[in-house]
Design a protein with these regions (language model features):
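Cleavable N-terminal export/targeting peptides
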Residues: 1-31
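N-terminal, post-signal peptide beta-strand-biased segments of exported outer-membrane/organellar beta-barrel
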Residues: 22-82
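Short loop/turn motifs that connect adjacent beta-strands in outer-membrane beta-barrel proteins
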Residues: 24-26, 39-47, 84-94, 108, ...
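Outer membrane beta-barrel transmembrane domains
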Residues: 27, 34, 55-57, 201-293
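Residues on the lipid-exposed face of transmembrane beta-strands in outer-membrane beta-barrel proteins
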Residues: 40, 52, 78-82, 123-129, ...
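Transmembrane beta-barrel strands of outer-membrane/channel proteins
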Residues: 50-56, 95-101, 138-144, 187-191, ...
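Outer-membrane pore/translocation modules
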Residues: 101-197, 202-203, 260
Length: 293
């Protein structure tokens, strides 16, 4: 069977799932593409912080995927961060937990499904370093298969699954350069290792993903930026141990603005996807709100 036909067959046998963004198995993954932007590499002082993300994602086509494809995702993602006073290897220690809440509408090839549920729980630990205008973060994130997941059936082959039904380990590096002249150059890079979906015997291939931001501070409180994300699958998916030799990729870019006050900030962006291969293609709007307790 040719790779494209095999991939399409797998999509209809297993159902198509998604949460915040999409990649790998059935065009879906747990990485929040585009969520981070300005000062992504700078951790705050010790304390407790609430970060709340809202994302609307719409895709009207699936490259090398099923016909008549439409995907609409609305996600509210609270992230609780605890920065401790402890230091290891010269870096400040912190922890975080993320629990997505997702509403997903999906249609493909004349079939449709809708789901609203909790997504997969994410837990992470991190170290942050600061040296003059340079800021770094090193982190390890675990994505647990806790979200709602329904195994597709012959009568319901297209399923709007919120959870992925597999676990992920994700090392992360982030960096920001913020000199006094107002420039803000930031990036967050990650690599994801996925285990097998026990219900489908499908293993999503390893992939590289990253957010980027090139911004400028217009005033003490207001910044503008060009932001986006990249995704590149570097290992093929597997079904029952056999490679499916199609790998996803995407590049997204768009404008962003940020307003920051004493103990809170809000960032908004609109990103359009291009250079898409073997995955949904669309656009996304994101809001990120940070509150320091």
């Amino acid at each position: 069977m040719k790779p494209l036909i095999l991939k399409l067959s797998v999509l209809f046998m297993l159902g198509i799932s998604s949460s915040m963004s999409s990649a790998t198995e059935n065009g879906a993954d747990s990485y929040a593409l585009g969520a981070e932007g300005m000062m992504a590499g700078a951790l705050p002082p010790p304390g407790i912080y609430l970060l709340t993300y809202y994302q609307n994602y719409h895709a009207g086509r699936f490259d090398n995927g099923p016909p008549n494809f439409h995907l609409d995702v609305n996600a509210l993602i609270p992230r609780l961060v605890w920065m401790t006073e402890k230091n290891y290897l010269g870096g400040q220690l912190g922890f975080y937990a993320i629990q997505p809440m997702v509403d997903l509408r999906l249609s493909a090839a004349g079939m449709s499904d809708h789901n609203s549920a909790l997504g997969d729980l994410m837990l992470g630990s991190m170290l942050g370093w600061h040296q003059g205008n340079h800021h770094w973060i090193g982190a390890v994130e675990t994505v647990l298969a806790t979200g709602k997941y329904d195994t597709p059936t012959a009568t319901q082959p297209v399923v709007a699954n919120i959870g992925k039904n597999y676990n992920t380990i994700r090392p992360i590096l982030a960096y920001s350069y913020a000199p006094p002249n107002g420039i803000d150059i930031s990036t967050k890079l990650s690599y994801s290792f996925n285990d097998e979906n026990d219900d489908t015997h499908y293993t999503s291939g390893d992939y590289f993903a990253g957010d980027y931001s090139i911004g400028y501070k217009l005033t003490d409180k207001f910044k503008v930026a060009v932001e986006g994300y990249v995704f590149k699958q570097v290992k093929s998916d597997e079904l029952h141990g056999e490679d499916i030799k199609m790998r996803g990729q995407v590049l997204a870019v768009g404008p962003a603005v940020q307003y920051q006050d004493k103990n809170w900030s809000i960032e908004a962006k609109y990103l359009t996807e291009t250079q898409v291969e073997n995955r949904p293609e669309g656009h996304t709007g994101l809001l990120k709100f940070i509150w320091a307790f």
